[in-house]
Swiss-Prot record:
Belongs to the universal ribosomal protein uS19 family. GO terms for molecular function: rRNA binding; structural constituent of ribosome. PANTHER family: RIBOSOMAL PROTEIN S19P FAMILY MEMBER (PTHR11880), SMALL RIBOSOMAL SUBUNIT PROTEIN US19M (PTHR11880:SF8). It comes from Oenococcus oeni (strain ATCC BAA-331 / PSU-1). This is Small ribosomal subunit protein uS19. InterPro entries: Ribosomal_uS19 (IPR002222), Ribosomal_uS19_bac-type (IPR005732), Ribosomal_uS19_CS (IPR020934), Ribosomal_uS19_SF (IPR023575). Pfam families: Ribosomal_S19. NCBIfam families: rpsS_bact. The gene is rpsS. GO terms for biological process: ribosomal small subunit assembly; translation. It comes from the Bacteria. The keyword Thylakoid does not apply. One of its GO terms (cellular component) is cytoplasm.
Length: 93
């Protein structure tokens, strides 16, 4: 289910505050955040945001085609280690 249009998009207030403070600077440092639920706004373009995946912060460079998506969509939380291998030593034909 999508979010109601009446409510509008959500972004963590502390993240918005950090973006606005760094907007005029030429050097843009990496912004660390735990807010995977925040929607990417057009003002985020050009920033690198390190999103927490439960273990570490993964840097994500924000581009214009990411606007409208959530930060958590670009950082997977689960590591796929592969399926169990087949035993070729089974007795058979």
């Amino acid at each position: 289910m999508s979010r109601s249009l009446k409510k509008g998009p959500f972004a963590d207030p502390s993240l918005l505050k950090k973006i606005e403070q760094l907007k005029g600077q030429s050097k843009k440092p990496v912004i660390r955040t735990w807010s995977r639920r925040s929607t990417i706004f057009p003002s985020f373009i050009g920033f690198t945001i390190a999103v927490y995946d439960g273990r570490k912060h993964v840097p994500v460079y924000i581009q214009d085609d990411m606007v409208g998506h959530k930060l958590g969509e670009f950082v997977p939380t689960r590591t796929f280690r592969g399926h169990a291998g087949s035993d070729d030593k089974k007795t058979g034909k």
